[in-house]
Amino acid sequence: MKKLVFLFLSLLTAGSLFQACDNSKTYAEMLEDEKNAVNKFIKDNDIRVISLEEFERDTITASKEAGNGYDEYVAFSNGVYMQIVDRGGKEDKNGVEVINEVDTFANNNVICTRYVEQDMMTGDTTCFNVPLERWMDVPDYYKFPLTFRYVQNTSTVYGIVLSGSLDYDLLWNSKGYGTAIPSGWLIALPYLRNNAHVRLIVPSKMGHTTAQ
């Protein structure tokens, strides 16, 4: 079913490790540096990590926004960490907020994505399409969301970036991120609904091809 749905992502990567020209290190050593950077970020921010088994008991992750007093991320076996800030699916029914439990992402949905991507190594904002104070005078950076078609079948899951006149994400294209949505983004979708907000720590192997 084709349906327009919305998603907000807060992303953390260590892409600068793999884009920098450092011929003194092997790929395996850079992967180890990335792992250490992720562990340091988790420790420095006092993040509690839970297993996928723990998470799937209720598919909830604690967050300071929800009043829990701490942040909690679920660790996936592929190195992705996820925190669901807002699962989405909220609707207004005659002035009462209700949750649409079946308003999940499905095959052939067109997903409009707003995101902020930061490099955890440098603290730099590397790509975004939301208004940020530093770039408020460059509206072309956040004029359009990133839109992609979500394809889900029995054997594969992938996202294809759309390229219509209202789908042009300026920074995404200028960085050469291409037409494939990073697999690290897609891992969150089965747990979310329309208008969700999720935070992800995405390792290079699950991120953009430019960081692999």
Stretch-by-stretch model annotation:
Residues S16-A20:
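C-terminal motif of bacterial Sec signal peptides marking the signal peptidase cleavage site
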Residues C21-Q212:
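Cross-family detector of peptidyl-prolyl cis-trans isomerase
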